Amino acid sequence: MTDTATSAGKIQPRLKQKYKTEIAANLSKDFGFTNVHQVPGLVKIVVNMGMGEAARDGKVIDGAINDLTLITGQKPQVTKARKSIAQFKLREGQPIGAHVTLRGDRMWEFLDRLLSLALPRIRDFRGLSDKQFDGNGNYTFGLTEQSMFHEINQDRIDRVRGMDITVVTTAKNDEEGRALLKQLGFPFRSVEAAS
């Protein structure tokens, strides 16, 4: 960090500080890494809302964009259909969803809010499945509704919208990715509870 950033009092996100001070050292010790660049870290978080109903009703996409903006603090990119499919009444170029890619401090702050505020608010939440890794240490999970985020006003929800959240890491395999996310505080379901 530069001297100007330090003197201006730039505050690092809580989870990022924890990663730099504790988690990186723990992972380095657990896996026997000799180089700091071998230690897995976070690259980006992608939050995606697919809105199939947007093909029939154009106003649906506006609600999704508004919700994603409130949740992530960043304007979403509108996803458009790549090709026309007659059975789904879908035309090429029609908006069918929205997604946000978070990097840097915004990513760390979103992850902190997700883990400490949003996930505990889910009714009957028993933890996330640890089987949703892609083989390269990246983790994807879905949320069924947007109301668990504090930023969303419960009274102004026009319809329930689910979302997919992908956490992209620099881990080489699922074992490293799982260890990183567990140390960051991801509430994975225990093996006994799953069976």
Swiss-Prot record:
It comes from the Bacteria. InterPro entries: Ribosomal_uL5, Ribosomal_uL5_bac-type, Ribosomal_uL5_C, Ribosomal_uL5_dom_sf, Ribosomal_uL5_N. Pfam families: Ribosomal_L5, Ribosomal_L5_C. Keywords: Ribonucleoprotein, Ribosomal protein, RNA-binding, rRNA-binding, tRNA-binding. GO terms for cellular component: ribonucleoprotein complex; ribosome. Gene3D superfamilies: 3.30.1440.10. Disulfide bonds: none annotated. The keyword Methyltransferase does not apply. GO terms for molecular function: rRNA binding; structural constituent of ribosome; tRNA binding. GO terms for biological process: translation. The keyword Phosphoprotein does not apply. This is one of the proteins that bind and probably mediate the attachment of the 5S RNA into the large ribosomal subunit, where it forms part of the central protuberance. In the 70S ribosome it contacts protein S13 of the 30S subunit (bridge B1b), connecting the 2 subunits; this bridge is implicated in subunit movement. Contacts the P site tRNA; the 5S rRNA and some of its associated proteins might help stabilize positioning of ribosome-bound tRNAs. Belongs to the universal ribosomal protein uL5 family. Part of the 50S ribosomal subunit; part of the 5S rRNA/L5/L18/L25 subcomplex. Contacts the 5S rRNA and the P site tRNA. Forms a bridge to the 30S subunit in the 70S ribosome. This is Large ribosomal subunit protein uL5.
